[in-house]
Amino acid sequence: MSGFDEGNVTVSGGGGKGGFKKNNGFVEDTSVRDLFKRFINEWKDQDNVFIYKEQLRQHYNLGWHYIEVSIDHLTDFNQELSGRFISSPNELMPSFEDAIKDIIKEMNYNKEQVDEDIQILFKSSANPEPIRYLRAGLISKLVKVQGIVISASRTQPKPSTMVVKCKNCQHTQTLHIRPGIVSSVLPQQCERGSNDAGKPCPNNPYVVLSDQSTFVNQQILKLQESPETIPTGEMPRHIILSLDKSLADKITPGTRIKVLGVLGIFEGGGKRREIAGGTIRTNYLRVLGITSDNAGRDSMHFTPSEEQSFKVFSRRQDLRNIIASSIAPSIYGHEDIKRAISCQLFGGSSKKLPDKMRLRGDINLLLLGDPGTAKSQLLKFVEKVAPISVYTSGKGSSAAGLTASVIREPSTGEYYLEGGAMVVADGGVVCIDEFDKMNVDDRVAIHEAMEQQTISIAKAGITTILNSRTSVLAAANPVYGRYNDAADDNINFQSTILSRFDLIFIVKDPKNEKRDFIISKHVINIHEKSSRSGGSGSVGNNTYDLSNTVVDDSHIGENEVTIQYLKKYIAYARSRISPRLSEDAVTTLKNHYVSVRAKSKEQEMINNGSYGGGGSKNSVETERKKRKNAIPITVRQLEAIIRISESLAKMSLSPIATNEHAKEAIRLFDISTFDAITTNNTVNETLTPERLENIRTAEKYLKDRVPIGSSIRIKDVRFQLSRSGLDHFTILKAVDILVGRDEFEFRNQKRTLFRKQ
């Protein structure tokens, strides 16, 4: 092998009937063929079953033209053959395929020729090679890599044997196209030279006879390093995968896989190649086998001693307190938020209904509050300890970057699908900071991903559905930066997005001398300890790979556990426990939901009724239609409490979510989401006729002073109306009513009032 994937076409005589195959000077090795044939026929498992011979027979009878072979078995059978295959797979693959054909001929006595090639798929237990460390020394060798598929092309036909005919003399020949990413170059000169009349054949005389050629399916994937394996500060690396035959159309973006293949190179297109004079080559992997990689989806291996330690730990009375204390221990306070985050890490139980519908078990969490309350630090901590996680900022995220996009390849003009953050984080957590800074249209794009946990794409002729089984942990600031106790001045999100969050926490920074003293002391202690230890004092730059780490009771402290122990305990609980509600818990949750709905209705009636006592009837009716709770109470909130109850049961390794778990879930819901609802509906003052008259005066003033299509600053409105003797509440109420009627709208983060009609 020369290193470059050249010599793409091999010729086998005239007439298109096969002949002797040349493969870059390699002559077919009959000893390799016979040896591999013996391996398929003679290899037995522990039950004395000829597994490969039986597998080949079953697959061929079912019309499945492939066989899966373990390289570990091949090594045990003949180490020299295995070693030669690993170092020179391209040379041995034709002999292996011919050996399979021979075996099928022996199985089918009435058939002299096998109609279709049998694809050999390989698997290995060897450790994968990092994508960023694939170097020139591995070219043309068998390598194993792992990562996440971020894009996939459409499957297209690729010729394996191409029959061509000269337009002048009708001479035909068969071209054998090598597998992988290669270009099919037709001969420029006719071998015969002239026709029967002596007329010479021109240059480039051949045309392809498609009806006599054979084709295989080929698909191109892009494999990227898993987010948790990328070193801090480094860009993720990727490699192109070439899949053919039975492997095509099996993998979608967002899937984590381990790939066994031959490292090759092809000519890269675009400006880079032009600048380098055509010498640039791009790595790719010709795939010989794919296995699903569930390492991020809680598939760690646990020793018996670890399982025993987990069971003992789960029976501790202070289990929830210990786990909550282990969530971002460097951050003071926020005990209930940490409990909610621990529930999110454990997750509820996903369910598949008889009608094929799926109910999500992942928990979504929103932190809304003042700056400096450690919201971003909590997100960063979760990003580092979750098995799969993606951290992004709302300002720098687009709808396509979060969900999926259809990209056009510049060199070929072909469209392919590329998954975004919520596809890459399938099975983990997406942390979105500055959630309030996102464009409204971009937030709408993640509605389906947050509830149905799928992403539907219908662009550029590509129609598909991608999995997005992720939890969302988002952090946002109120409208004016800091939380304002006045009504409707804080949450500026649509109810459609808010209803998809299971828990919504209002995080305030109250000015309390005693609390400020405790926090300052805590922060200073952290800095002092960090200085003495000479380290960063946090897990911020570490990614814990626990697949080969054994944890024991030494990782359990008096008030908290180590990150290693917590992460492995979470993986154990998620993989082994799928709780269901007890009868008592069902009754408790049902009664609570009915009660909360009644309270929400009462609160809404109070808000709507606050416009009563006189005034225009149409104005009152308009307000009743327009003004609703920012955070609605729907069936989604009932499902949220169910998921939290299940996560609390999973936390204690209990298969049943009891009444006690349900009560704790209700408590978390009441102090978060329901508290946020009542906090944002604090205006329940009954308006007197005098107050209503003042509101109408303010409305008339604004309509007279602001022409349609013009704006006025809220600061100027307050200043001018206050000079007329109107109080702050009356001014805000008048503005709020005008906005509710859709006559005015807020702009520039509620600093400007624009008149629409």
UniProtKB/Swiss-Prot annotation:
A motif (Arginine finger) lies at residues 499-502. It comes from the Eukaryota. GO terms for biological process: DNA replication initiation; double-strand break repair via break-induced replication. Residues 606-625 are annotated as: Disordered. It is an enzyme of class 3 (hydrolase). The keyword Ribonucleoprotein does not apply. Its EC number is 3.6.4.12. GO terms for cellular component: cytosol; MCM complex; nucleus. It is found in: Nucleus; Cytoplasm, Cytosol. Gene3D superfamilies: 2.20.28.10, mini-chromosome maintenance (MCM) complex, chain A, domain 1, Nucleic acid-binding proteins, P-loop containing nucleotide triphosphate hydrolases. SMART domains: MCM (SM00350). GO terms for molecular function: ATP binding; ATP hydrolysis activity; DNA replication origin binding; helicase activity; single-stranded DNA binding. Keywords: ATP-binding, Cell cycle, Cytoplasm, DNA replication, DNA-binding, Helicase, Hydrolase, Nucleotide-binding, Nucleus. Residues 319-523 form the MCM domain. It catalyses: ATP + H2O = ADP + phosphate + H(+). Component of the MCM2-7 complex. The complex forms a toroidal hexameric ring with the proposed subunit order MCM2-MCM6-MCM4-MCM7-MCM3-MCM5 (By simililarity). PANTHER family: DNA REPLICATION LICENSING FACTOR MCM FAMILY MEMBER (PTHR11630), DNA REPLICATION LICENSING FACTOR MCM5 (PTHR11630:SF42). Acts as a component of the MCM2-7 complex (MCM complex) which is the replicative helicase essential for 'once per cell cycle' DNA replication initiation and elongation in eukaryotic cells. Core component of CDC45-MCM-GINS (CMG) helicase, the molecular machine that unwinds template DNA during replication, and around which the replisome is built. Belongs to the MCM family. This is DNA replication licensing factor mcm5.
